[in-house]
């Protein structure tokens, strides 16, 4: 299993505020409503065991879930296992959200005396793996996929969920053709108790963390921070590498604080515009999640067009094609914000 020490940009980190005492627990973590009714089953070891109509098979690659077979139908599921004591916290985000085409939810939940078993539909890889294996995603395909990602985030924000740890790896494919995405792992989300989305817990993945989370301020607004992370995801899809890279965390975080990145050559003007609308250093200047869906790049044919140099300003300098997702370097960058 990867760790923060390995500098994996997809692995979460936790950063405490550097000044002032920590306030009381964030309101989003307070109990709201009861979770859905659970089926009670005996406690048992999770591997190679029968569990109601399911049989649990080997662990999945990440070691946090298991393949499961629904015996009556032969359908394969993913089973996530949690301590039974965490049932309320795990299920609360799912009970808050109405069903949505691009947000995963448990097909069935079984509660034992010690363990909670949540069964999700089988997936076929995730966006991080797709970009890592293929590099840049062509604009038409990227727009098709990103529209689904933005719709999932907008649905969560509209119903009082802040994701905090948004990244490509959390968007998984539900079909073999890899054309339909759902957002998973909502159990990590903050459930807001009102319109205020102010958060104090600074938790994110290094490559996706917003500049406001790296500041010395004790709190930050959760929804714009999610939008920044979604902007990082979009840039990575279109460029094949992260917008902010550094061989050490201090270098990476310095670039994020400055908002320094360079868009790749060959992108259409609407695509470039959308990336810049999401990766704004000031949270209040970013698009809201619902506004992303109204952007021209997601409304029509996003085929790349040749850009005239007259359309390129200092904020539009480009880097050569071919950089991989794991490649790092300092060349070709320009600070987008003063």
Residue ranges and their predicted role:
Residues 305-338:
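Regulatory extensions appended to serine/threonine kinase catalytic cores
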Residues 280-285, 291-305:
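Terminal C-lobe "cap" of eukaryotic-type protein kinase domains
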Residues 169-207:
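Activation segment/activation loop of eukaryotic-type protein kinase catalytic domains
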Residues 157-174:
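Catalytic-loop of the protein kinase fold
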Residues 145-146:
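Activation segment signature within eukaryotic-like protein kinase domains
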Residues 127-137:
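AlphaC helix of the protein kinase catalytic domain
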Residues 105-114:
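Short beta-strand micro-motifs within the conserved protein kinase catalytic domain, predominantly
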Residues 113-126:
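Conserved short submotifs of the Hanks-type protein kinase catalytic core
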